[in-house]
């Protein structure tokens, strides 16, 4: 019995990890669109403010991948900043299109889930 419970817990954690990956990417793109440009630590704070606790080791590789995929552009800025230069990310045209498609798909999935719950 304990083995089944542990297996279910592992399956649940795996499912949550997979869901969060796609959802986190959607949230990051949405935040960047709303802000215009954002640097990594600011992004972490904004995610935390809406109860999405994410580690730096998760966000920075994701930002780098989305930058490499052409969804984001990155620029180093030092003007008007106290301290070290910061790498700011902004949405590209491809990123904006991708966000629109992802948002629509996400809304359809949530709608279908809600409909299933009402049956």
Task: Enumerate the language-model features and the residues they cover.
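Short, intrinsically disordered or compositionally biased N-terminal tails of bacterial proteins
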Residues: 1-15
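Short beta-strand/turn micro-motifs at beta-sheet edges
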Residues: 14-18, 76-78
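Short secondary-structure boundary/capping segments
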Residues: 20, 64, 80-81
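Basic amphipathic alpha-helical segments that dock to polyanions
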Residues: 59-61, 65-66
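Accessory beta->alpha helical hairpin/"wing" motif in late/C-terminal subdomains of nucleic-acid enzymes
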Residues: 91-95
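Amphipathic alpha-helical dimerization/coiled-coil segments
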Residues: 96-119
